[in-house]
C-alpha cells in the first residue's frame, strides 16, 4: 500500500489510521493548541494536520523502514495534494497528476523483462510491509510483498479470498500477450499507476519503494507468463 497519507484530505485522519497504524495514545491538546471545542471551526485539512502532527496522537519522530520518520511519511507530496479534497478533477489537475506520475518513472537499466512468476505469485499474496508502531515489520526478518490479491482476483481458484476493490486480473496475459508495449504498460501501472489512472487508490509500489524493480518484474511474470496460474 501507499506508505503516505491518502489523497483525500477530508478522509485524511481515517487513512492515516489505516495506512500507517495509530501510534501512541489518543490525541490530547498541547500548550497553545486549540481545544476540541474549536475543531468544528477548522477546515478538514487544518483538523487533519492538527490531529496528526500537533495533538500528540502519533509518535511522529519514530523511525520508519524507509529511513525517515512517521511524520515524514504522513506528509503529502505534490501528487497527493493535487488529488486531495476534490470529488471531481478538472482537466488541468488531471494533466498535472499525469505529468507528476510520468516524471517519477524509473526503468530497469537492462530494459523491462519478466521475472519468475512463482516469486510473483508469492509477492502478490504477501502482506508483510511497512507497519510501524507496536507491531513493526522487520525487513531483516522477512521479505516484503505487494498483497495484490487484497484488491484483485488473480486466479479463478482463489476467488473466494480475493479482493474486489480493483478489477479482476484473471487471464491478464492471455488477453494482452507479452509484447513490449504490454510489458511497458504493466510495469508503469505497478510503478506509478497515476500515469494512467489519475488519483487512483492503487498504491505507487515503485516510486514509494514498496516494491523493487526486481519484485515488479516477478509480479509482471505472474500476470503475463503463459505458464502462470493467472492465465490458466
Identify the residue ranges that each predicted region occupies.
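Short coil/linker segments at helix-helix boundaries
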Residues: 102, 130-144
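Generic anion/oxyanion-binding catalytic loop in active/binding sites
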Residues: 18, 108-109, 137, 205-208
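Extracytoplasmic electron-transfer domains, predominantly the class I c-type cytochrome c fold
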Residues: 33-43, 47-48, 115-119, 132, ...
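Disulfide-bonded cysteine motifs in exported proteins
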Residues: 78, 143-146
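Sec-dependent bacterial lipoprotein signal peptides
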Residues: 10-12
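Post-cleavage N-terminal segment of exported redox proteins
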Residues: 2-5, 14-16, 22-130, 222-232
Amino acid at each position: 500500500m501507499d506508505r503516505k497519507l491518502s489523497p483525500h484530505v477530508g478522509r485524511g485522519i481515517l487513512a492515516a489510521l489505516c495506512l500507517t497504524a495509530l501510534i501512541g495514545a489518543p490525541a490530547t491538546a498541547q500548550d497553545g493548541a486549540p481545544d476540541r471545542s474549536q475543531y468544528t471551526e477548522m477546515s478538514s485539512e487544518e483538523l487533519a494536520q492538527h490531529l496528526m502532527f500537533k495533538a500528540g496522537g502519533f509518535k511522529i519522530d519514530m523511525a520508519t523502514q524507509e529511513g525517515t520518520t512517521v511524520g515524514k511519511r504522513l506528509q503529502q507530496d505534490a501528487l497527493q495534494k493535487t488529488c486531495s479534497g476534490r470529488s471531481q478533477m478538472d482537466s488541468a489537475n488531471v494533466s498535472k497528476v499525469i505529468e507528476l506520475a510520468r516524471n517519477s518513472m524509473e526503468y530497469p537499466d537492462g530494459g523491462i523483462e519478466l521475472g519468475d512468476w512463482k516469486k510473483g505469485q508469492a509477492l502478490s499474496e504477501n502482506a508483510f510491509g511497512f507497519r510501524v508502531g507496536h507491531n513493526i515489520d522487520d525487513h531483516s526478518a522477512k521479505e516484503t510483498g505487494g498483497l495484490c490479491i487484497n484488491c484483485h482476483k488473480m486466479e479463478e481458484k482463489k476467488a473466494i479470498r480475493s479482493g474486489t476493490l480493483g478489477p479482476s486480473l484473471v487471464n491478464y496475459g492471455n488477453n494482452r500477450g507479452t509484447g513490449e508495449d504490454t510489458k511497458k504498460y504493466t510495469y508503469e501501472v505497478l510503478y506509478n499507476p497515476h500515469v494512467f489512472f489519475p488519483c487512483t487508490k492503487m498504491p505507487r509500489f515503485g516510486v514509494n519503494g514498496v516494491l523493487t524493480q526486481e519484485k515488479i518484474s516477478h509480479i509482471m511474470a505472474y500476470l503475463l507468463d503463459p505458464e502462470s496460474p493467472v492465465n490458466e
